Amino acid sequence: RLTVMNENVESAINQIGVQLSSRYDMLAAALNQAKDYDVCMACNLIAKVNFHRCVITSVSTTGEVMEQEKMIQSVLEELEKMVRQHPEINENKDYSKFMEAVDSYGRMLQTSTLIYNDSVTKFNRAVCMIPAKLIAGIMGFQQCSYLENIRCK
């Protein structure tokens, strides 16, 4: 039972990794569209994304997940400033399509975070109960940490 619950937690964080990766891909595509309006700033943001991006897997920590989302939020804020300087960017249909996808993956990420936290709650409860607590110790299972609620723009 503990093994299945642990697999559920790992599966949930893997799903978060997929959502983050897709969110990064769509953000990069939007930035490529924005290059037509402000090459320097768009290239700097693309470089920032490429430098800080990392893959989230079942062995990733909640801190790593939060760092990745904070990074995306930071780039989105800078991109928003660029759009204020060049409002015609919003008229680019491809840019708008990619930004809608960034938002959509953000909502999916929020849902995946809720699923992850629910899986962690069930697992942590099971790990604390006797006799499972004894078995968990022998098998090397420890309580998992929760993810903060991700608020995507």
Predicted regions and their residues:
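A helix-centric hydrophobic-segment signal that preferentially recognizes long
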Residues: 1-153
